[in-house]
């Protein structure tokens, strides 16, 4: 069940024509929350172009590079259901500004960390901050979205996707201009947004609107058999999609570095791919009101995999780069739809349901990076990346079994 704004939309709501001639009322606070999502996730996007640098600096193997993704998964993803249960039960809103601040401070110091163990420790703690933001951000978004939660969730998701997209280019150009040791400066923008949220966020109002009617528990979330089946399918679908996306983000930069491609090229490729996916997700979320969500999720799975495999087969080269950008776009545009579908089958636990999609399934995909790195060492990076690209096809049957609408 998604909590909706009751009564009239906020006085200063943004109004725009809807798909069916209706009006979309979105609270301006939603854009501030989306901005926090942008800066929360921009730091997570730093690591894509940094993998080759860190690999050389600390003398890492492919499996050890995969371990970085595993640490990210454990901290920022698998912990999200715990944060989701906490926020559903107590309605904590301070995480919307404290979490991005913690992430910014810890992750921005990667350039001055002297050892691999300390690097992993800082990454782990910084990713915990990122994890604390997502469940609450996703659960308050429908409340701030008026009568069109699909549009609101797309705006919220686009903030994170654009941040994750900007991360590779920002860190690549920053390091090229000022050096790896200057990265602590990058914590400043997130601190400013956190301060704005602290001053402007209507914390009491949001806490009241999103408070559950009953005590939130894991047992309660999975009490309904039909809802449980849908949630498990959604988790599996997002897991398969995320294996492809995380595999692309983890290992393709290493492959590009082996081909002597510059750091800025790596950053630009991933920024274009993720930014396009964020933009398309807003359109797709609006379109879902006409087509239903299931068909668009199926397109994301069934079309994204062939594009990814084709991109790997033709890379490097213009055709391969274009296919990879298209693959990343198609694989990620269904994320807001999956979150909303999970919330609608969550009872009184929207934050916990959101965390299953944004965190738990993402984390499981991160754990898969270590064995995939081992496979790459055995059969080579190109062969392993083809396997990664085809992975979403495992979710086709689960897509077909989702409820219509």
State what each model feature region is:
Residues 12-24, 205-234:
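Juxtamembrane intracellular "pre-TM" segments in multi-pass secondary transporters
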Residues 47-48, 229-271, 278:
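Extracytoplasmic gate region of multi-pass secondary transporters
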Residues 78-114:
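Conserved MFS/SLC helix-loop-helix module at the cytosolic interface between two early adjacent transmembrane helices
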Residues 79-91, 280-292, 376-377:
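Helix-to-loop junctions at the C-terminal end of transmembrane segments
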Residues 94-108, 296-310, 389:
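Structural signature of the two symmetry-related core transmembrane helices
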Residues 122-159:
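Cytoplasmic helix-loop-helix junction between adjacent transmembrane helices
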Residues 156-202:
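Helix-loop-helix hairpin linking two adjacent transmembrane segments in secondary transporters
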Residues 348-379:
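A late C-terminal transmembrane helix in Major Facilitator Superfamily
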């Amino acid at each position: 069940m998604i909590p909706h704004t009751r009564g009239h939309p906020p006085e200063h709501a943004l109004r725009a024509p809807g798909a069916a001639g209706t009006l979309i009322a979105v609270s301006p606070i939603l854009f501030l929350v989306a901005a926090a999502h942008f800066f929360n996730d921009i730091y997570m996007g730093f690591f894509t172009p940094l993998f080759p640098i860190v690999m050389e600096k600390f003398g890492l193997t492919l499996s050890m590079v995969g371990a970085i993704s595993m640490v990210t998964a454990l901290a920022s993803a698998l912990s999200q259901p715990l944060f989701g249960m906490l926020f559903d039960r107590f309605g904590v809103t301070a995480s919307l500004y404290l979490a991005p601040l913690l992430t910014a401070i810890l992750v921005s110091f990667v350039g001055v960390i002297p050892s691999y163990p300390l690097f992993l420790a800082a990454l782990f703690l910084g990713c915990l901050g990122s994890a604390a933001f997502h469940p609450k951000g996703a659960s308050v978004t429908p409340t701030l979205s008026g009568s069109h939660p699909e549009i609101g969730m797309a705006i919220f998701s686009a903030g994170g996707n654009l941040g994750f997209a900007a991360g590779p280019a920002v860190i690549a150009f920053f390091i090229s201009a000022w050096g790896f040791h200057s990265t602590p400066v990058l914590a400043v923008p997130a601190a400013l947004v956190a301060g704005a949220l602290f001053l402007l966020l209507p914390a009491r109002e949001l806490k009241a609107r999103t408070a559950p009617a009953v005590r939130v528990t894991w047992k309660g979330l999975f009490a309904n058999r039909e809802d449980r089946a849908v949630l498990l399918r959604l988790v599996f679908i997002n897991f398969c999609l995320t294996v492809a996306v995380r595999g692309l983000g983890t290992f393709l930069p290493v492959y590009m570095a082996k081909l002597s491609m510059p750091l800025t090229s790596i950053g630009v490729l991933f920024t274009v791919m993720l930014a396009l996916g964020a933009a398309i997700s807003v359109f797709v979320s609006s379109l879902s009101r006409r087509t239903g969500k299931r068909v668009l999720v199926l397109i994301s799975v069934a079309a994204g995999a062939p594009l990814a495999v084709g991109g790997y087969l033709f890379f490097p080269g213009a055709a391969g780069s274009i296919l990879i950008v298209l693959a990343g776009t198609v694989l990620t545009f269904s994320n807001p739809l999956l979150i909303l579908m999970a919330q609608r089958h969550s009872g009184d636990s929207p934050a916990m349901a959101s965390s299953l999609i944004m965190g738990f399934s993402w984390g499981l995909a991160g754990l898969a990076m270590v064995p995939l790195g081992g496979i790459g060492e055995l059969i080579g990076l190109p062969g392993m990346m083809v396997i990664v690209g085809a992975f979403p096809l495992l979710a086709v049957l689960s897509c077909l079994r989702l409820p219509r609408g």
